[in-house]
Amino acid sequence: PDLLEKKKNGMPVIAVNGSHKYCMDHGLAPSAMVMLDSREFNNRFIHPLSKDCKYFISSQCHPSVFDNLEGYKLWIWHCAGDTDNEDLLKEQYGDNYFPVMGGSTVTLRSIHLFRMLGFSKFEVYGFDSCIIGQHHAYEQKENDDEQVIDVVVADKEFRCTAAHYHQAQEFVQMTGKTGEFYDLAVHGDGLISHIIKNPDSLRRKEEVN
């Protein structure tokens, strides 16, 4: 309800991966959608397609994603640190391109992507980076069998996957370097919202005991 009201008042909704469909199903048609992952199964995340949505797709994404988005509002962005494609990018753009820095997940890169596009205030929903009931707010079978570990932030315990934990570590590193350039609010009671209050206390449980 909070996000619905904010959208009605003019706040653009930016979705990543499977949250695009989740938003569409709940009356929150996104203004934009971002994808980073190169695996082919991610092409399902762009559906249902919308003529009103701007699709920001990383150049490393699977070709089928670009095929499905033909005729839609599509922007291609490039990841900083992707040294394999540096020669190709220089051949195409010369020195006139600006790769997007950030962590290894789509949410972390999206913060920097939209900061580069002029946005300086972000309110992030569903960015828990831990398991609260299930690993995602919607079905995503690709993550069903991932190993679960216990982590601690300021004496509060969280269950998360190795990917969640790595993302949390990258979040601390990223905001430590670039956090002064944007205003970031993370909603909810997940791992990330607690890290913001206690950025130096993230540990695996066995390191604490």
Language-model segments: residues:
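Metal-ion/cofactor- or nucleotide/acyl-coenzyme-handling active-site neighborhoods
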Residues: P1-N209
